Amino acid sequence: LGYDLALLSMGGLQNQSEEQLLERTREVAKIIPVVGFYLQPSVGGRVLTYDFWRELANIENVFAIKMAPFNRYQTLDVVRAVCNSSRRNEIALYTGNDDNIIVDLLTEYEFNINGESVKKQIVGGLLGHWSVWAKTAVQYFEDIKAIRDNAQIDASWLSKAIEVTDANAAFFDPAHAFKGSIAGINEV
């Protein structure tokens, strides 16, 4: 096919059960490695359970998950589910949470899994937001990679995180349930 991985969206499949979505993923993963995709409900996605993400993480040939639920609790469900998987070291996590880009990339998630401390970081972003200022995005990402393992991170990164989220509002139209997202990206 000429592709390395397929980003497999669960969007538009609200009539499918979680088990049907998992079976669909298993079938696609037989053909090509998969990146699971958690898309926020306001733009066609749906809420998926912790159990769904734990099972998805256990599917051979799933190698990454893009998390874009725009919801901290749902993002935590995915990270915790992957950490609970025996395949946790094989699965890369990417943020698609344009409303929390910098914090997602700076955070090291840590969970107690059966008495063991398990840590996981988001390794990158697949973000519509960054499509409008790629040079700055790349610079921020390089800067974040250089500092995120430090014991202390300058507080200015928290201010920068809010500035990026504020800019996100201009692109994605959250005031109108993200209905202007495509037009916003195209305009900017």
Q: Whereabouts are the PLM-identified features?
A:
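Scaffold signal of the M16-like zinc-metallopeptidase fold and its non-catalytic homologs
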Residues: 182-188
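Catalytic alpha/beta core domains of metabolic enzymes, predominantly
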Residues: 30, 35, 40-182
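Active-site beta->alpha loop and helix N-cap motifs at the rims of alpha/beta catalytic domains
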Residues: 1-53
